[in-house]
């Protein structure tokens, strides 16, 4: 009776299994495997081909795995529930549910041990490390090629020595068969592993590491030590890597499916298992028959191979194929890749209650609604409908309800209306690139088959109506409906999570209508009418008394400071009064907001202001009104365009002629040898790109002018479309009516001859041919980039998925310094923009008066930003995700504002995912949109600095020289010019290139728009610092210097060639020295000799023996020709930054202050050392031919670039620290996105960077168990050190390491998350050996094990659970104190 009762509560076991908070993975011992299984499989048969019943003891045996039909044994003796749990004495099958066939396992007892291929072949090979042999040697033993000495005895053989058959026979003859023990195959390896004394090995290895001098030995010993220690710590035995029992997975997971025509489709695993069983049985038979050794050995090898194929087919040897040469899918393949178990079934599941259809626009919907076709709703809400019909008494059973619904009577539709009301549904458009790709709407039943979507939601879904489809999902439970309504309803997602700007913004027709309405083409002196309110205006418009653009006087109602009603009188156009009528009443919302032209950007700003001042509800209503007004007036205006609206500028021909003359001039200079071919190319490209811009400018000027016509003013339609931001851009119009300009070859180089025609004039055949390049490149790029952008997003999501907001404030947060970002002297991002939404770490003070503008610990909002701008603050110290000291996740104070809500972030928000999506989403957008500008090249070379504002010029790090013409030449490598206003506040900073000409002295007053300095953008000069006679040294004709005569011009110039091509010349150092009249080398100001080393490709500007003056150019090094800038450069650049890859030509950063000294050459590289005033010099090897920024003996500061290029982020972290790294990294990523006009908040990039800095590399192990060079999680490292310090021991020391996102994802604490990302086999083998425990902290691992994610609702639930457990433990502890324990036994923990 008791048994049956327990059977009734069978499910209680399941809940036990679900209540866990971490998962551990270890090796399975043979005993463990046997404990899982329900019996041994002895036969390879599957099912009987006549009866279709499973064979006894076969792969589908019902006795082992359970019955085929619910509660029915195989022979049919026991049927029905009442015999539950009985085992039939005839067929041996337990009477139970048939779904146990999905969970019961079997096993195969192997006749001989077999090595597990993952631990053998997955690098580093764990088996070969454990036995301390090479992988090749272990393989030769396992696959029966060589014998191995297991126990040498007194023979003088080495332990683990390999012997072939002849050697074995020879030694056995020599020493006798019993004197030593040798073996072959997995048995031999098994006995070696069994005989290992782990503790002894550990001691020996520690000694070896201390004593060894060889780096290789040390590394291998450390690897072995780690392996041995993980065995000791986890209590696993190394011999478990060799299998003696193989588990067989449940039959329902590898089914046999009958097909039509009596054939069967089978899972590949069945084939693989059959192979193993066949060979195993044959081996048993051969051993019983005492067959010759050679036959048995061959059979053992075949068994090993078949087990290998079962676990990981194709990992070793040839792939085992099934029918039609198709490789069989092994167990490993079931797990890995996009189609594997992790990504296909655990992270992405199919859902019910969903449908999909084409979308059409629903202009009359409210923002929170979507149109749902009746048919779809009927199908989706069927269960609810049955329940409702039942409740209404229209149907008493489900069957009746079903019939009723099939008839589709009116009662059914009425009931459906009631159910659907206020039951939100989720709409999703693929690809879902960010969280706004899934939003909740209230369905509104419509006729037809298409889903209606609100036009303002298109931007969030990136949807258009050219055939896009969307999926509908129904949230079923009350909790799901609640979350959908509160968190996901489209009206709750007005702001974009990536930048905090509104994403619900009118576009296209709506913008065009609003723009047209806000036009004021002619302001008349005398108004056309006086009106009291909007009703009167609308009446006058409808009767035709006034037009939309007539100037009128009317009243505008608003609120004053105290919130009382205030009426203002304004004079403007009727259209603007219509717009003003939509504005909500609020003291901060003024008439001037709307009394201007309204292109898209301005409309976005207005919506933003309304949201900040009036809240969400008002904004939603306002947006809906804007939409209606926009559509209405776009339709009323009737804007369209014909070909005459594309006006080609009259002076286009003249501009092109001028440019052609300029280019002829360059050709002459080139033919006279004044400039090289590369320089000519650069100048020509420059000239044409300037010409194109001029033509485009003229065209825009022509189009933007309004013309008077008898019936009012005519505004150019095309201009309106582009200027308003409704459709098209200046770049596209330039191609339609200006000139197409320069285009790039597929390689990225720019073709010198531009396309002079535009599309309206039509292209010539040659121009058309040239432009086909751009068109095709665009399409090819799009296809390729979409994939790579999606992959970038996936990697970002994977690295950041476990980062959430864990508490309000951490204990001792650090801070970062924010300043405005300058590019070429222009402020690109103001300080207030960067500071918005951050929490201040110190008081922000006015730099002039010193008064506190914003107190510390305050979140900077829009009002705070205005204060910062007004006070002219230059720096702010604010908290950042990068410097947060929380152990798990990040605290809300360091994160700041939740951009999508405009308020402080909530605890439990999944900020990692939001950041990953914010960075990944525009990547895809941009890549999908590369081809819009048709490969037209846009080139802008900076060659001068023109001031933006007036002020006083200050030269920072001044190092100047006057040349013979009295020009000031900049000789400093990091000279900067700054402009200061009258208060001495810096208003602009410019970096100046070496060799620039300065037109002003330090302290001079400069006006706005004055040229203060210029340089040649195409070459880097080498400049003489003293006057003297130039002398060539090691510049030998034909070896290190050659005279090139240009074919076209016949002019010759001398350039340095690579002299190292021949080995005999490697010690040459081509240079130019300056000597005085007596032939002595002149000393420079810093007491070094005036020598100038030259690199290959330098063009000499002086002759041997020529007299030169200080400031003259000795040689020029041409810079690379310009390539087009496109996100194509951008996306790989972003990926390169996040992967922390080494760039091809990376910069070299000085590690300390000191003097630059040139040393001897080492293997064709120039050795340079920096000698500090005291201490060891730091040495660098620089490939020859690279241009070094410093000359012999010059002083260099820490962090300066010795060699130009992209610096390595690792170097910045090591030399300058985390704050500098953050600044550099954020700016580099932002530069790429800024170029595309995409705004992303800095904190998203910082969030990812935080995840890349999770690990610490151990330098000194102190008293910890860490080994030098080991990578340890930062939190673990800190915890260990805290413990050690508390115990009075030496803590370990280490330094932060920057890891690429892929590597960081694979190195997370969670092996489940890492395994589902990439390299599944490697991650799992590694985790099993280490006995890793997954604490289930991230989102991904929780999705995989099927629990609530620990963010949002899940975070709160976890918190409650923890509080409950703590309370229980406290209560139990108190109870124990009260009740004295009667037993004397110690309780087991």
From Swiss-Prot:
One of its GO terms (cellular component) is DNA-directed RNA polymerase complex. Zn(2+) 2 binds at residues 810, 884, 891, 894. The keyword Repeat does not apply. GO terms for biological process: DNA-templated transcription. It catalyses: RNA(n) + a ribonucleoside 5'-triphosphate = RNA(n+1) + diphosphate. Its EC number is 2.7.7.6. It is an enzyme of class 2 (transferase). Binds 1 Mg(2+) ion per subunit. Binds 2 Zn(2+) ions per subunit. Keywords: DNA-directed RNA polymerase, Magnesium, Metal-binding, Nucleotidyltransferase, Transcription, Transferase, Zinc. InterPro entries: DNA-dir_RpoC_beta_prime, DNA-dir_RpoC_beta_prime_bact, RNA_pol_asu, RNA_pol_N, RNA_pol_Rpb1_1, RNA_pol_Rpb1_3, RNA_pol_Rpb1_3_sf, RNA_pol_Rpb1_4. Its cofactor is Mg(2+); Zn(2+). GO terms for molecular function: DNA binding; DNA-directed RNA polymerase activity; magnesium ion binding; zinc ion binding. It comes from the Bacteria. It holds the Pfam family RNA_pol_Rpb1_4. Zn(2+) 1 binds at residues 73, 75, 88, 91. The keyword Protease does not apply. Mg(2+) binds at residues 464, 466, 468. Belongs to the RNA polymerase beta' chain family. DNA-dependent RNA polymerase catalyzes the transcription of DNA into RNA using the four ribonucleoside triphosphates as substrates. PANTHER family: DNA-DIRECTED RNA POLYMERASE, DNA-DIRECTED RNA POLYMERASE SUBUNIT BETA. The RNAP catalytic core consists of 2 alpha, 1 beta, 1 beta' and 1 omega subunit. When a sigma factor is associated with the core the holoenzyme is formed, which can initiate transcription. This is DNA-directed RNA polymerase subunit beta'. The gene is rpoC.
């Amino acid at each position: 009776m008791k048994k049956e009762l327990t059977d009734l509560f069978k499910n209680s076991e399941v809940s036990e299994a679900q209540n866990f908070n971490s998962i551990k993975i270890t090796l399975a011992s043979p005993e463990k495997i046997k404990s899982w299984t329900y019996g041994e499989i002895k036969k390879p048969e599957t099912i009987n081909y006549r009866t279709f019943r499973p064979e006894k003891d076969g792969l589908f045996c019902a006795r082992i795995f359970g019955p085929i039909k619910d509660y029915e044994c195989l022979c049919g003796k026991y049927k029905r529930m009442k015999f539950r749990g009985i085992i039939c004495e005839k067929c041996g099958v337990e009477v139970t549910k048939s779904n146990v066939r999905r969970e019961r396992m079997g096993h195969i007892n192997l006749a001989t041990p077999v090595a597990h291929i993952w631990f053998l072949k997955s690098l580093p090979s764990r088996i070969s490390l454990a036995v301390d042999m090479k992988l090749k040697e272990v393989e030769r033993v396992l696959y029966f090629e060589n014998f191995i000495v297991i126990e040498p005895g007194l023979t003088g053989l080495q332990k683990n020595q390999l012997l072939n058959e002849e050697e074995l026979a020879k030694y056995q003859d020599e020493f006798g068969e019993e004197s030593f023990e040798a073996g072959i195959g997995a048995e031999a390896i098994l006995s070696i592993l069994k005989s290992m004394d782990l503790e002894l090995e550990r001691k020996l290895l520690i000694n070896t590491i201390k004593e060894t001098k060889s780096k290789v030995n040390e590394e291998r010993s450390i690897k072995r030590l780690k392996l041995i220690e993980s065995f000791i710590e986890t209590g696993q035995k190394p011999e478990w890597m060799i299998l003696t029992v193989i588990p067989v997975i449940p039959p329902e997971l590898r089914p046999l499916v009958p097909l039509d025509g009596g054939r069967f489709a089978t899972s590949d695993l069945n084939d693989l298992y059959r192979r193993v069983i066949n060979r195993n049985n044959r081996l048993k038979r051969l051993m019983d028959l005492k067959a010759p050794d050679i036959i048995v050995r061959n059979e053992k090898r075949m068994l090993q191979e078949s087990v290998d194929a079962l676990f990981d087919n194709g990992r070793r040897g040839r792939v085992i194929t099934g029918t039609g040469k198709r490789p069989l899918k092994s167990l490993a393949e079931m797990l890995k890749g996009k189609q594997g178990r992790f990504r296909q079934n655990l992270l992405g599941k199919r859902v019910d209650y969903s449908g999909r259809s084409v979308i059409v626009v629903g202009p009359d919907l409210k923002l929170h609604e979507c149109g749902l076709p009746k048919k779809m709703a009927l199908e989706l809400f069927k269960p609810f409908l049955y329940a409702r019909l039942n409740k209404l008494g229209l149907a008493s059973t489900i069957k009746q309800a079903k019939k009723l619904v099939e008839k589709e009577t009116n009662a059914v539709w009425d009931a459906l209306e009631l159910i659907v009301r206020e039951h939100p549904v989720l709409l999703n458009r693929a690809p879902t690139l960010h969280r706004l790709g899934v939003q909740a709407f209230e369905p509104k039943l419509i006729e037809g088959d298409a889903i209606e979507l609100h036009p303002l939601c298109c931007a969030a879904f990136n949807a258009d109506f050219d055939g896009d489809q969307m999926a509908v999902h129904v949230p079923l439970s009350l909790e799901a409906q609640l979350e959908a309504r509160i968190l996901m309803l489209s009206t709750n997602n007005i702001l974009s999570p990536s930048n905090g700007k509104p994403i619900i913004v009118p576009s296209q027709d709506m913008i065009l209508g609003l723009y047209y309405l806000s036009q004021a083409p002619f302001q008349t002196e005398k108004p056309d009418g006086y009106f009291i309110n909007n009703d009167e205006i609308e009446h006058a418009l409808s009767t035709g008394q006034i037009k939309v653009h007539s100037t009128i006087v009317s009243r505008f109602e608003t609120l004053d400071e105290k919130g009382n009603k205030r009426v203002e009188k304004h004079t403007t156009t009727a259209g603007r009064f219509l717009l003003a009528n939509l504005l909500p009443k609020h003291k901060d919302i003024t008439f001037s907001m709307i009394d201007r032209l309204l292109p898209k950007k301005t409309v976005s700003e207005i919506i933003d202001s309304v949201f900040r001042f009036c809240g969400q509800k008002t904004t939603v209503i306002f947006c809906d009104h804007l939409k209606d007004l926009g559509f209405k007036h776009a339709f009323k205006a009737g804007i369209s365009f014909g070909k005459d609206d594309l006006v080609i500028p009259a002076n286009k021909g003249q501009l092109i002629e001028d440019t052609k003359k300029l280019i002829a001039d360059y050709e002459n200079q080139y033919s006279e040898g004044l400039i090289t071919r590369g320089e000519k190319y650069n100048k020509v490209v420059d000239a044409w790109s300037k010409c194109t811009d001029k033509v485009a400018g003229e065209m825009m000027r022509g189009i933007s002018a309004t013309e008077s016509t008898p019936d009012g003013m005519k505004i150019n339609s095309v201009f309106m479309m582009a200027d308003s931001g409704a459709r098209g851009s200046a770049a596209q119009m330039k191609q339609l009516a200006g000139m197409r300009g320069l285009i790039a070859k597929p390689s990225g180089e720019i073709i010198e001859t531009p396309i002079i025609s535009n599309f309206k004039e039509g292209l010539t055949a040659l121009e058309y041919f040239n432009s086909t390049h751009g068109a095709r490149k665009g399409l090819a790029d799009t296809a390729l980039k979409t994939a790579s952008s999606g992959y970038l997003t996936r990697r970002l999501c994977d690295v950041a998925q476990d980062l959430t907001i864990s508490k309000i404030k951490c204990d001792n947060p650090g801070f970062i310094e924010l300043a405005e970002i300058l590019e070429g002297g222009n402020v690109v991002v103001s300080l207030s923009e960067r500071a918005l939404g951050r929490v201040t770490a110190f008081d922000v003070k006015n730099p002039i008066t010193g008064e506190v503008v914003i107190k510390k610990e305050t979140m900077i909002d829009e009002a705070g930003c205005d204060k910062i701008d007004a006070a002219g603050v230059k720096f702010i110290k604010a908290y950042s995700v990068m410097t947060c000291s929380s152990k798990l996740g990040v605290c809300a104070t360091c994160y700041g504002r939740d951009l999508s809500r405009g308020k402080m972030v909530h605890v439990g928000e999944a900020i990692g995912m939001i950041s990953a999506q914010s960075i990944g989403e525009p990547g895809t957008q941009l890549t999908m949109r590369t081809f819009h500008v048709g490969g037209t090249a846009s080139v802008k070379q900076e060659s001068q600095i023109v001031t933006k504002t007036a002020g006083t010029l200050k030269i920072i790090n001044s190092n100047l020289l006057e040349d013979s013409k009295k020009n000031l030449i900049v000789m400093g490598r990091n000279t900067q010019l700054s402009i200061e206003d009258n208060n001495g506040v810096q208003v602009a900073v410019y970096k100046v290139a070496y060799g620039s000409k300065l037109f002003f002295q330090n302290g001079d007053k400069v006006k706005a728009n004055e040229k203060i300095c210029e340089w040649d953008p195409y070459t880097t000069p080498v400049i003489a610092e003293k006057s003297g006679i130039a002398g060539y040294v090691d510049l030998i004709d034909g070896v290190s210097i050659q005279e090139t005569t240009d074919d076209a011009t016949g002019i010759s110039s001398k350039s340095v060639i690579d002299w190292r091509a021949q080995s005999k010349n490697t010690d040459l150092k081509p240079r130019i020295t300056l000597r005085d009249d007596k032939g002595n080398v002149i000393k420079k100001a810093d007491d070094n000799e005036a020598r100038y080393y030259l690199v290959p490709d330098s063009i000499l500007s002086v002759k041997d023996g020529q007299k030169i003056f200080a400031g003259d150019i000795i040689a020029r090094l041409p810079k690379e020709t310009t390539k087009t800038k496109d996100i194509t450069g951008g996306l790989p650049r972003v990926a390169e930054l996040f992967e922390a890859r080494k760039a091809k030509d990376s910069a070299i950063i000085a590690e300390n202050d000191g003097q630059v000294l040139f040393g001897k050459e080492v293997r064709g590289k120039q050795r340079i050392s920096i000698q500090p005033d005291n201490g060891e010099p730091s040495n660098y090897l620089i490939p020859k031919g690279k241009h070094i920024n410093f000359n012999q003996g010059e002083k260099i500061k820490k962090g300066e670039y010795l060699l130009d290029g992209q610096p390595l982020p690792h170097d910045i972290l090591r030399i300058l620290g985390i704050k500098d790294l953050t600044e550099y990294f954020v700016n580099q990523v932002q530069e790429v996105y800024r170029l595309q006009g995409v705004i992303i908040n800095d904190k998203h990039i910082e969030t990812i960077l935080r995840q890349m800095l999770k690990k610490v590399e151990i330098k000194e192990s102190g008293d910890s168990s860490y080994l030098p060079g080991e990578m340890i999680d930062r939190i673990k490292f800190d915890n260990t050190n805290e413990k050690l310090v508390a115990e009075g021991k030496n803590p370990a020391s280490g330094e932060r390491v920057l890891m690429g996102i892929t590597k960081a994802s694979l190195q997370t604490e969670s092996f489940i998350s890492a395994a589902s990302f990439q390299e599944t086999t490697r991650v799992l083998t590694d985790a099993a050996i280490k006995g890793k425990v997954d604490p289930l902290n991230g989102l991904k691992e929780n999705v995989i094990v099927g629990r609530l994610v620990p963010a949002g609702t899940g975070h709160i639930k976890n918190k409650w659970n923890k509080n409950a457990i703590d309370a229980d433990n406290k209560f139990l502890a108190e109870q124990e104190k009260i009740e004295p324990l009667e037993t004397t036994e110690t309780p087991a923990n």
